Amino acid sequence: MSSSPNSPIACNLPRVTIVGAGRVGSTLAQRVAEKNLADVVLLDIIAGMPQGLALDLMEARGIEIHNRQIIGTNNYADTSGSQIVVITAGLPRKPGMSRDDLLKTNAKIVVEAAKNAIAHSPNAIFIVVTNPLDVMTYLAWQATGLPRDRIMGMAGVLDSARFEAFIALELGVLPADVKAMVLGSHGDLMVPLSRYATVNGIPITELLDAATIERLIERTRNGGAEIVELMQTGGAFFAPASATSVMVESILLNQSRLLPVAAYLQGEYGLEDVVIGVPCRLGCGGIESVLELILSDEEREGLHTSAQSVRQNIERSQEILANKNNS
C-alpha cells in the first residue's frame, strides 16, 4: 500500500481526508480544493485510483487558481493529523434499491474506515456520507467513541437543497431566493417542513396550493431514487458533494451556520440514542448546538416515525456486524 508521489502535505495547513474516491469523494475533493478550504487526502482501497485522481486535480490547480495540495493514497498513515474526515466509501445505490438495502455491505466498510481514520486523526471531526446515512453515522459514532459534537452525517443539507430546487422550478424563481429545511432520516420518511419554506421571506403556503406543495414534498423524498433510475449506473454525486462541502466550510471557517445535519440526539425533540436530521449550528468544534424547532403534532409524529425506522436499522446493522465478527 503506497501513497502518491505528489509533494507531501504541510503539517501546519488544514487537512481534510476523504475516505472513498468514488464520484462523491472525488467531486468533494475538487470542491474543497477549489474553494481553497484545505489540503486534501483522497483515500481508497483500489491501488492507483486515488493517486490518479489526485494527480488530475493537481494539474488543474493553475486553471482554477489555487495552491492546495492534493494527494491520493491507499494508506491511512497518510491521513494523519486531519482536521476533518469525510467517509464516502461504500456500495452505491442501483436502480430499485433503497438506501436501507445497502445496510449489510456498507456497515462493515464504514466501521473499518472510522476505526482506521480515528487512529491517525484522533482530534478530527467526522462527517459520514455513506448510505443508509443515519445508521452509518451511528455506527461510526460507536466505532470511534467520539463525543457527539464531533461526528455527524450529511443528509439534511442535500434534502433541503432538493426541496428548494423543486420549489424554485415550480415558481420559476432564483433557487438562492428559496429557503427550506428538511428534518428526519435520509430516506422515504424524511420530514420536509413546508411551514418554514420561504421565497425571499414569503411563505410558500402563500404562493402554492396544498396539493402542489405535497407533490413537491414527495418528489423531494424520492429525489435520490429519481436520479438513480435515470442514470442506471449509480446515484447523485454533484449535489451530495456540494452539500458536504458546505458543512466542511462552516467547520473550517468557524461560520456557525445553521444547517440540517444528522446528529446523535440526547433528549432533543423527545428522542434519545438515535441519529436523525435536525438543525445544528456548525463551527470549528463541530456541532456547537442543536436547535429545537417548534413542530406541529404531525411534524413531530413524522420525526418520531423516522427515528423509529432508523433505530430498527441500527439494531439490524449491529446484528449483522456481530454475526460477521463471530463467523
Curated annotation (Swiss-Prot):
Keywords of the record: NAD, Oxidoreductase, Tricarboxylic acid cycle
Gene3D superfamilies linked to this entry: Lactate dehydrogenase/glycoside hydrolase, family 4, C-terminal, NAD(P)-binding Rossmann-like Domain
Family listed: Belongs to the LDH/MDH superfamily. MDH type 3 family.
The name this protein goes by in its record: Malate dehydrogenase
Catalytic reaction equation(s): (S)-malate + NAD(+) = oxaloacetate + NADH + H(+)
GO molecular function: L-lactate dehydrogenase activity; L-malate dehydrogenase (NAD+) activity
UniProt-listed InterPro entries: L-lactate/malate_DH, Lactate/malate_DH_C, Lactate/malate_DH_N, Lactate_DH/Glyco_Ohase_4_C, Malate_DH_type3, NAD(P)-bd_dom_sf
Species in which this protein is naturally found: Nostoc punctiforme (strain ATCC 29133 / PCC 73102)
TM annotation in the entry: none
UniProt: NAD(+) binding residues: 20-25, 44, 106, 129-131
Gene: mdh
